Amino acid sequence: MSEKINANQDNDRQITLVDDQGNEELFEILFTFTSEDYGKSYVLLYPAAVSDDDDVEVQAFSYDADEDGDVTSSDLHEISDDDEWNMVQGVLNTFLSDDRLSGE
């Protein structure tokens, strides 16, 4: 299991998150993007254990990468601003509706 995201390489596509009860869960990275309006980078994740038949709950976080582009779970930040959430949701909707981006 990897605890790092490398935003510059496609082969590091997983991160382990720990919930409030100390339970670890492995997540796959759906995609990352940067918003010039908010001056932040974002990562969208989904549980690695999801099968193709399951509905997927996507989680989004802003993040701070180090100078090598690496990110650990402690570098993820919850999105609390409604306008920021709406922007992230819009990017996700565009991704999901564009077959060229989502790989379908």
From Swiss-Prot:
This is UPF0473 protein LGAS_0424. Belongs to the UPF0473 family. It comes from the Bacteria. It holds the Pfam family DUF1292. InterPro entries: EF_Hand_1_Ca_BS, UPF0473. It comes from Lactobacillus gasseri (strain ATCC 33323 / DSM 20243 / BCRC 14619 / CIP 102991 / JCM 1131 / KCTC 3163 / NCIMB 11718 / NCTC 13722 / AM63).
